[in-house]
Amino acid sequence: MDPNLKQRIIDEAYVLFLTKGMKQTSFCDVAAAVHKSKGAVMHYFSSKRHLIDTVVKMRFFPASQLSPEMDYLEGRRWDEFLRSYKNPIERVIDSFPEKLEGNGLMYYMQFVSSANEYMDEFPQMYHELLTREQDFLFNAVVVIYKQSVDDIQVLSLIHISE
């Protein structure tokens, strides 16, 4: 038995869901992509919904998350922050396999639309992702604003003392 088969199924299903859409992707398509039988795929995933749920939770949402480095950059200079920050869509597209380069936004939109259709909890999960992102950005702006105010106060003190 292939010890990495479950992960390979998830990875190949993700690519197929991105390129073909969830509705148009069958277990046979996934099986062909991993060079196994449909039964081998069904050994790990009893239904298409189970496979979709796993792909969304193990590939899509982890790729959407902020990297730990962004916490460090939150208190840095604004230009440094802006150079490093990527929104959730950019982060997911950057995680796509090389063979999907060039049409990332189209694949992203197709995936989100399909996931919304297949997973009842997807809208809530997506909303939570965007809420966390909004909170992070708000906090980053507050920190940078406070730094700017402090810088202005220091500069005005320097100017007054001259």
Where are these regions (language model features)?
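Conserved small/polar residues in nucleotide/adenosyl-binding loops
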Residues: 158-162
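Solvent-exposed, amphipathic alpha-helical segments
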Residues: 8, 12-19, 65-66, 108-111, ...
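Amphipathic alpha-helical packing segments from all-alpha helical-bundle domains
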Residues: 107, 116-146
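N-terminal intrinsically disordered/low-complexity leader segments
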Residues: 1-3
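Helix-turn-helix
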Residues: 8, 16-58
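Hydrophobic/aromatic residues within well-ordered alpha-helical segments
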Residues: 48, 55, 59, 63, ...
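Short, charged helix-capping/linker segments at alpha-helix termini
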Residues: 23-24, 147-151
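Hydrophobic alpha-helical connector segments
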Residues: 54, 68-104, 155-156
